[in-house]
């Protein structure tokens, strides 16, 4: 029986500066760390870290997600980051705090959540 070919991990040349993109929706959180030109260095989501269902949108899930992405980028040599947050989800602050605890120096924090100029009609209010 033939064995599957072993995939080599792509070697990434990382500078010390980078950008952390945090996308916090109502259902999930995704953290992507790129270099200044936009090439992905590491990424992580709440589902990738073992959270399922409604637990994916908790501050603890965002903390674990940001820590795992930051640890991988730190091991590759990244030290200073700019943070860009998008979305209304909970755990935005916890993600930034865990980036700092992982050893990355946060230079700037900017909120790039897209705001409609009276665009689409929002979903109706829930009645539970």
Swiss-Prot record:
UniProt GO BP: translation
Keywords: Ribonucleoprotein, Ribosomal protein, RNA-binding, rRNA-binding
PROSITE patterns with a match to the protein in the record: RIBOSOMAL_S11
Any one Gene Ontology molecular-function term assigned to this protein's record: rRNA binding
GO cellular component, one term: ribosome
Entries under InterPro entries matching the protein: Ribosomal_uS11, Ribosomal_uS11_bac-type, Ribosomal_uS11_CS, Ribosomal_uS11_sf
Subunit structure: Part of the 30S ribosomal subunit. Interacts with proteins S7 and S18. Binds to IF-3.
Function: Located on the platform of the 30S subunit, it bridges several disparate RNA helices of the 16S rRNA. Forms part of the Shine-Dalgarno cleft in the 70S ribosome.
Family: Belongs to the universal ribosomal protein uS11 family.
Name of the protein: Small ribosomal subunit protein uS11
Source organism of this protein record: Chloroherpeton thalassium (strain ATCC 35110 / GB-78)
């Amino acid at each position: 029986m033939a064995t599957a070919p072993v995939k080599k991990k792509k070697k990434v040349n990382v500078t010390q500066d980078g950008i952390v993109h945090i996308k916090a929706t109502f259902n999930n959180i995704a953290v992507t760390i790129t270099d200044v030109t936009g090439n992905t260095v590491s990424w992580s989501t709440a589902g990738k870290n073992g959270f399922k269902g409604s637990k994916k949108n908790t501050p603890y899930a965002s903390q674990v997600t940001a820590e795992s992405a930051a640890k991988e980028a730190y091991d590759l040599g990244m030290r200073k980051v700019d943070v860009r947050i998008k979305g209304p989800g909970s755990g935005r602050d916890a993600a930034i705090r865990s980036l700092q605890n992982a050893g990355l120096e946060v230079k700037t924090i900017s909120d790039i959540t897209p705001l409609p100029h009276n665009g689409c009609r929002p979903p109706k209010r829930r009645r539970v």
